[in-house]
Amino acid sequence: MIRLLHLSDPHFGTEQPEVMAALLAFAAERRPDLTLLTGDITQRARAEQFRRARAFADQLPAPVLSVPGNHDLPLFNLVGRLFNPYGHYRNHISNELEPVYESSRLLVIGVNSTRPQRHKNGELSERQIERVSRLLRSARSDQLRIVIQHHPVRAIEASDKANLLINHERIVPRWIDAGMDLL
């Protein structure tokens, strides 16, 4: 059995110590094989927030595969947003914005759905969509195939529909056709 821990939107900078301690205890008890961290790791993409997130991730009992979220890009620091939008993310979390994890039973493909010119409403390029499709098609039949990204493709509440990934209605069927098991 493969055991995954999925964490999204911890928003370091607003984290509560008792919640972080409970998450670490839960992870230690469950002993996941891999942790998936799917964006909004920080509240305002500040170096100190990323340092705290890194310190937390280093305490997890499994490797961490992460993708950035819109809060992981500078919002008010326009120079940083334009010229080095992923600088703190790369310095503290991962140099890779679209990581891939593969084992004999698992393939996890990370996709960066953020755009420096936009604070919300994630988007994927045709190149990104095709890259994921190609990797999914190349997976072995006995591998669980997972795609991770920050922006949602479904909304339960009508008010959340404004936050959906742009063009999700055409992206998801392509990935399903390519063999995706979980998004």
Language-model features and meaning:
Residues A28-L34, N121-L183:
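His/acidic metal-ligating clusters that form di-metal
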Residues L7-S8, T35-D40, V64-N70, N112, ...:
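Active-site neighborhood of phospho(di)ester-bond hydrolases with catalytic His/Asp-centered motifs
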Residues R51-R134, A139-S141, R170-A178:
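Extended active-site neighborhood of metal-dependent phosphoesterases/phosphodiesterases
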Residues E18, Y89-I93, L165:
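Short gly/ser/thr-rich secondary-structure transition/capping motifs
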Residues M1-Q59, L75-F76:
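N-terminal active-site segment of His-dependent metallophosphoesterases
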Residues G13-E15, Q43-E48, N70-L78, R115-K120, ...:
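Active-site environment of divalent metal-dependent phosphoester hydrolases
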Residues L7, E29, S103-S104, V147:
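Short, flexible segments with low predicted structural confidence
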Residues I2, L106, Q143-I146:
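Alpha/beta-hydrolase fold active-site loops
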